[in-house]
Amino acid sequence: MALRKGGLALALLLLSWVALGPRSLEGAEPGTPGEAEGPACPATCACSYDDEVNELSVFCSSRNLTRLPDGIPGGTQALWLDSNNLSSIPPAAFRNLSSLAFLNLQGGQLGSLEPQALLGLENLCHLHLERNQLRSLAVGTFAYTPALALLGLSNNRLSRLEDGLFEGLGNLWDLNLGWNSLAVLPDAAFRGLGGLRELVLAGNRLAYLQPALFSGLAELRELDLSRNALRAIKANVFAQLPRLQKLYLDRNLIAAVAPGAFLGLKALRWLDLSHNRVAGLLEDTFPGLLGLRVLRLSHNAIASLRPRTFEDLHFLEELQLGHNRIRQLAERSFEGLGQLEVLTLDHNQLQEVKVGAFLGLTNVAVMNLSGNCLRNLPEQVFRGLGKLHSLHLEGSCLGRIRPHTFAGLSGLRRLFLKDNGLVGIEEQSLWGLAELLELDLTSNQLTHLPHQLFQGLGKLEYLLLSHNRLAELPADALGPLQRAFWLDVSHNRLEALPGSLLASLGRLRYLNLRNNSLRTFTPQPPGLERLWLEGNPWDCSCPLKALRDFALQNPSAVPRFVQAICEGDDCQPPVYTYNNITCASPPEVAGLDLRDLGEAHFAPC
């Protein structure tokens, strides 16, 4: 199970045992006893003893053990037997370990547990049996471990649970049954678990949930039912879980959610229904979920949004609707979501967004509409979204950006318009975006930029214009961008840059001019930290001497190549990005790198 769903307690426990005490015997030779204050260590294990609190941990992990080691001290508090070849545990094998609080048996070959295998472990709090071969567990197996707080049974082969299997475990907080083969659960499967906080049933074969299944779990906070075979969620199935805060239903086969399916979940904060087959949402799908903060509905088959679907979700902060089949956003589609901060609608089939569709979303900070085919956006469509700071419109078939499209977005920081097939942006289209920091116009079909396109964008730091069809840039086009830090105009058709184009960009540090048709360039401003020049037909005559001198004096700013940083164990052969300044003329130096030309070549200059 991932740490997002209940693993935090386990992680903290593991750290505490690993860090036990000031005296560690793990580095001693096998069989070497501890110092005088500590008990002897089994020959095949290593031990860690903390004499301040009189706690002993015995580590017998990954020793190819086929039976339990002899001589485990009776006062052991933590015993690690994971990653061995134990196929069975004899009855009463731990009868002399009454102080044991932590037992790790995961990653072994256990096919079953004898009914009395855990006899004597009345103080055991954490039991890990994950990644074994367990097919069934007899009633009474856990009768000798009344203090259990965490029980890990994930990644076994359990196909059924007996009624009353967990009876008597009133102290259990965390039960992980994920990644087994459970297809049906009896009504009384969890009887006796009145104190349970987290229940993981992910990765099984459950196709049906009956309301009686969760009766008696009034303290449950987190329920993970992801990656099963559920086809529908019926009414009242969770009605007896008043304290549930997180419910994971993602990656099932859910096609229908009944009205009232989530009734009673007054404490619910997180609901994940993503990666299912939900085709529609009714107005009474989410009533009563007044505390819900996160709702994930991405990767379904939702074709439309009914009015008032979300009207009860007054405190919702994140709504994910990406990768559905929504074709239109009508006026007030999100009424009631006044606290929403993140809205994703990417990769739907949106062709039309009505003016007023986003009315009421006064707190939205991030909106993703990418991967649709909007073709055009009405003027004022984003009005009222004054707190929006990131707007994603990549791959949205926009074609043109008209004046007032972004009216009202006074707080916008990042605007992503990549891969839209844009052939034009009208001069006043970006006016009013005084707080904009990043503008991405990559991979469009722009042939020119209006003179005053960037008027009022005095805070812009990142401007990305690569992979367009720009043949020229007006001399005053970048004048307002006095805070520009990063400028990318690579992969265009630029033949020359006006001498004054970069004059006002005193803070520019990154400039990418690769793959254009430039023949000459005077490096400016002086503070450049990275300048990319590869892929241009450079005329290495006198006008280029200043560039040659700059490149030689600043090799880190104009590197000949950059090697990609490789991380992890699966590193491929090094990848190099080259930054050649290859001369196309005069003929006598064609094919040479500008930096390799000597002073004699420029003597006539």
Swiss-Prot record:
Quaternary structure (record): Forms a ternary complex with IGF1 and IGFBP3.
Assigned GO CC terms: extracellular matrix; insulin-like growth factor ternary complex
Residue spans crossing the bilayer: none
Upper classification of the organism: Eukaryota, Metazoa, Chordata, Craniata, Vertebrata
LRRNT domain: residues covered: 32-74
Free-text function comment from the UniProt entry: Involved in protein-protein interactions that result in protein complexes, receptor-ligand binding or cell adhesion.
Alphabetic keyword roster: Cell adhesion, Disulfide bond, Glycoprotein, Leucine-rich repeat, Repeat, Secreted, Signal
LRR repeats: 75-96, 99-120, 123-144, 147-168, 171-192, 195-216, 219-240, 243-264, 267-288, 291-312, 315-336, 339-360, 363-384, 387-408, 411-432, 435-456, 459-480, 483-504, 507-528
Carbohydrate attachment residues: N64, N85, N96, N368, N515, N580
GO biological process terms on file: cell adhesion
InterPro entries: Cys-rich_flank_reg_C (IPR000483), Dev_Immune_Receptor (IPR050328), Leu-rich_rpt (IPR001611), Leu-rich_rpt_typical-subtyp (IPR003591), LRR_dom_sf (IPR032675), LRRNT (IPR000372)
Subcellular location: Secreted, Extracellular space
Annotated PROSITE patterns: LRR
Superkingdom field: Eukaryota
Gene Ontology terms for molecular function: insulin-like growth factor binding
Full protein name: Insulin-like growth factor-binding protein complex acid labile subunit
Biological source species: Papio hamadryas
